[in-house]
């Protein structure tokens, strides 16, 4: 019964009430902050549980009054209202009981890379990045370009954005994977549709305390910054390439105005990539142990197709197809895809958890 699953959370909430009134805890700012955060996270479950138990009691009370000559009709109406509210609240509680992704509230690095398709892939990196920027603006997020490498015919061979905002990772984590585009290039005289692909990686921004990098594991090279077509854009060696020797991961940054800023930005991206690598390894291990696939955007798999001649956008993970590609790209309306994805994975998680 759902009420039995809720009891440990309520017990823990009440226990935290007692702990937080302890003078020793009050004087320990670090512990106080940690425990207060845990209690705040339990607040929604506590409130929903109280309402849930109240509804169950109300249903039982009104059932006993159905035969009452004076209160029977009133009890019938009240019973109907409570029985209508109950399943909605049960679904809400099931979502609250799901394990929280510790990265959900973090800022993200959004990395786009041109794949197969040459110049057309680089152009689509630019188009998709523009659509993501519109999406971030609509949601009230802030963004900045961390690193970019322009394509020879426009667009970008690689582009990394830092997107800041509450819940940025929780929304955009589903964008990680291979995005395929089908359209007629402007240079195509025969009107033939070309297929190209780009990859998107979503990595949470991490605090220094979350991942430790040994300075001896880093190889740092400085070089001349290059712009469109590879030409030099300044006369100082401000571009920085950071190599993490144990993993072979390489980050190049040249968008900052100084070598120091480029080095800091490159190390931030490197930390995010290392953290993301560790998280994926952890998820893969858990997935094998549970023998089920959670899947929040396996970057090796094709997740979405953008077909311009048909004005179609299809997400292959949930078999969702929308014939409004132009509107979605123009206004960054990715919630039309993200919301169904979230609902799908939440339903899957609820089923796997046996709730």
Curated annotation (Swiss-Prot):
One of its GO terms (cellular component) is cytoplasm. Methylated by PrmC. Methylation increases the termination efficiency of RF1. It comes from the Bacteria. It is found in: Cytoplasm. GO terms for molecular function: translation release factor activity, codon specific. Residues 278-293 have a biased composition (Basic and acidic residues). Its main location: cytoplasm. Residues 278-308 are annotated as: Disordered. The modification N5-methylglutamine is found at residue 231. Keywords: Cytoplasm, Methylation, Protein biosynthesis. InterPro entries: PCRF, Pep_chain_release_fac_I, Pep_chain_release_fac_I_sf, Prokaryotic/Mito_RF, RF-1. It holds the Pfam family PCRF. Belongs to the prokaryotic/mitochondrial release factor family. Peptide chain release factor 1 directs the termination of translation in response to the peptide chain termination codons UAG and UAA. NCBIfam families: prfA, PRK00591.1. This is Peptide chain release factor 1.
